[in-house]
Amino acid sequence: MNKIYNEFINYSKNNFKRNLSWLDRDVDSPTHGSFDRNYWHYKITDFNSDILQQGIYTLIALYKENIPNSYNKLKLKKLILSVTKYTIKSYQKNSSFNEYYPNEDGYPPLAFISNVLGDTFIEFPEFLELKNIKKTYKEINLYLSKLTEFNASNQYAVGIAGLYKFLKFFPELKNNVNINFHLNNILKLQDNEEGWFNEYDGFDLGYLSVTLEALSDIYEISENHKIINSINGIIF
């Protein structure tokens, strides 16, 4: 294993429990599955910041043993399902997701949640067959497909990655999602000479790393040569 990967494993082993402390694991709690401790525990806010549901990635990494651990896999899977159900329920409540304030209906939480749900269902496709999950997952992505985001490329790229993952399960909805329209849009946001993507009229290395990861996910699914050319523009 290379040095960077070893450092990542080290960091993960030392910090994943801190991340899990944000999760409401009480099966009798009405907020069971929420990753927003400020909401369900401290009561600092009166709504769930849905974008924090991405904490599910830690659970999935533990389940797949990408982070070494000795946890019971069945218990981990139940926790992953609880987060998935709570995320779906959060959308059902308002037909949107919130991040910073109630009724925000923000693009970032919608995009990132679409993406994380796609990754979750790729690992656990059986979750899609549970009551209301498939229906709501479709609603989330059909709504997302109607939106664009030209000021923050990282958000748009993640949203498009979420749509590509959605189409793995529902290829018959490709025309409804208009995926090529979104793909062409995101590629136009890249600087042709230097390879960076627009973030509020400029360059941002941190956001660019998010865009790079999203484009890599898109390429893995689509194998579109335009994407690999774009990725090469970022790296080289």
Q: What does each of the following model-derived ranges do?
A:
Residues 45-69, 73-222, 227-228:
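Aromatic-lined, polymer-binding surfaces characteristic
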Residues 1-51, 74-86:
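Low-complexity, Ser/Thr/Pro/Gly-enriched N-terminal "stalk/linker" regions
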